[in-house]
């Protein structure tokens, strides 16, 4: 076996791609900071039980597992950073009131999300803890859209759903609640025949409401239809009101409501949102409310946030990250060294051509040269 081969769906990141990823990472983290989010850096490796406090069976399947040679306990390579940030908020920071946190780091998946997807993503995201009101969801939604616009994306479609609708329907019907997992599978897969079979012997109101969910999809006007087809329950009314406000405040995106989209239902407790663009089949960013995420760490707090994969974002972003640079000669010259140092201190990229290598690879656009004129080193256009 060749020593240079990598595992399936694992790849090196070469300079041009790495430069673009880093450019986007900096842009997004700077934007998060402008909203008041503080950076945290959780470890790549944790005890398995700490990583699997939420996310259900899917997260367990996606998590690499290994044995700690020091303790003998099972460790996991993180597949999602969100539970780690919840642990930090609940156990380490232990603040009262609102906490805004953001992060960027690698996550590993045992299985790729798609045929050509990588198993090593660079997850970046932001979370708000401590505020149960819709204001936090509105801020996170706007921050997610800001991040996508900073990456140069346009014609964004924002899909909105709400975990509270199905939760309210199951809470009012014990028989439906017993079939909750099967109903969730049928709704998630848009399997209408299975849904009809599962609801055939339920109460008329519950049956009609559950069967309506896959068809309650469209622009914001579908919320009016939902109010006529779903039971008048406080939880459902509140969920529809929340979605109406989220749709109205989604600046710079085309909004679609999908009350039958329950991906992440086991994880979320309120509004859910996903961002799509033309030509990309999967969501490029996902977010929503998950108030119970800190419960496993002994401190359940209201929480809402979003995340995306920087490698995928870099692949589809039109942002040009090819940097300009100054080409300088290499010489043992104090004045030259001082000029190069001053330019670098000012934020310029200065590439010194080593002896015998006067050509410079096209990774940087050397649009200027550092040349000696009348005993002084000056920058001139090339």
Swiss-Prot record:
GO terms for biological process: histidyl-tRNA aminoacylation; L-histidine biosynthetic process. Keywords: Amino-acid biosynthesis, Cytoplasm, Histidine biosynthesis. The keyword Cytoplasm applies. Pfam families: tRNA-synt_His (PF13393). InterPro entries: aa-tRNA-synth_II/BPL/LPL, HisRS-like_core, HisRS/HisZ, HisZ. One of its GO terms (molecular function) is histidine-tRNA ligase activity. Pathway: Amino-acid biosynthesis; L-histidine biosynthesis; L-histidine from 5-phospho-alpha-D-ribose 1-diphosphate: step 1/9. GO terms for cellular component: cytoplasm. Coiled coil: none annotated. It is found in: Cytoplasm. Heteromultimer composed of HisG and HisZ subunits. This function is generally fulfilled by the C-terminal part of HisG, which is missing in some bacteria such as this one. Required for the first step of histidine biosynthesis. May allow the feedback regulation of ATP phosphoribosyltransferase activity by histidine. Belongs to the class-II aminoacyl-tRNA synthetase family. HisZ subfamily. PANTHER family: HISTIDINE--TRNA LIGASE, MITOCHONDRIAL-RELATED, HISTIDYL-TRNA SYNTHETASE. This is ATP phosphoribosyltransferase regulatory subunit. It comes from Burkholderia lata (strain ATCC 17760 / DSM 23089 / LMG 22485 / NCIMB 9086 / R18194 / 383). The gene is hisZ.
């Amino acid at each position: 076996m060749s020593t240079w081969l990598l595992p399936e769906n694992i790849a090196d990141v070469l300079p041009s791609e790495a430069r673009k990823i880093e450019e986007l990472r900096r842009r997004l983290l700077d934007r998060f900071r402008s909203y008041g989010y503080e950076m945290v850096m959780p470890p790549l490796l944790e005890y398995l039980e700490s990583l699997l406090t939420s996310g259900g069976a899917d997260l367990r399947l996606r998590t690499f597992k290994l044995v700690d040679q020091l303790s003998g306990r099972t460790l996991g390579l993180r597949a999602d950073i969100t539970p780690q940030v919840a642990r930090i908020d609940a156990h380490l920071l232990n603040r009262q009131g609102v906490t805004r946190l953001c992060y960027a780091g690698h996550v590993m998946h045992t299985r790729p999300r798609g045929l050509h997807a990588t198993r090593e993503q660079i997850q970046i995201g932001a979370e708000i803890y401590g505020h149960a009101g819709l204001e936090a969801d509105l801020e996170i939604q706007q921050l997610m859209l800001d991040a996508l616009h900073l990456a140069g994306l346009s014609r964004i479609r924002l899909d909105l759903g709400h975990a509270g609708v199905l939760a309210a329907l199951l809470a009012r019907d014990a028989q439906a609640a017993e079939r909750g997992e099967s109903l969730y599978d049928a709704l998630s897969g848009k399997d209408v025949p299975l849904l009809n079979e599962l609801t055939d012997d339920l109460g008329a109101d519950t049956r009609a409401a559950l069967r309506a969910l896959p068809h309650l999809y469209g622009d914001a006007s579908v919320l009016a239809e939902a109010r006529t087809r779903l039971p008048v329950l406080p939880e459902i009314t509140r969920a529809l009101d929340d979605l109406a406000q989220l749709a109205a405040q989604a600046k710079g995106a085309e909004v679609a409501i999908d009350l039958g989209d329950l991906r992440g239902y086991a994880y979320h407790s309120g509004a859910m949102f996903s961002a799509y663009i033309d030509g990309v089949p999967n969501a490029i960013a996902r977010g929503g409310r998950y108030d119970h995420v800190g419960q496993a760490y002994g401190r359940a707090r209201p929480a809402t946030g979003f995340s995306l994969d920087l490698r995928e974002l870099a692949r589809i972003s039109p942002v040009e990250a090819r940097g300009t640079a100054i080409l300088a000669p290499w010489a043992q010259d104090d004045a030259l060294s001082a000029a190069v140092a001053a330019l670098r201190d000012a934020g310029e990229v200065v590439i010194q051509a080593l002896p015998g290598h006067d050509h410079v690879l096209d990774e940087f656009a050397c649009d200027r040269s550092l040349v000696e004129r009348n005993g002084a080193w000056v920058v001139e256009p090339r």
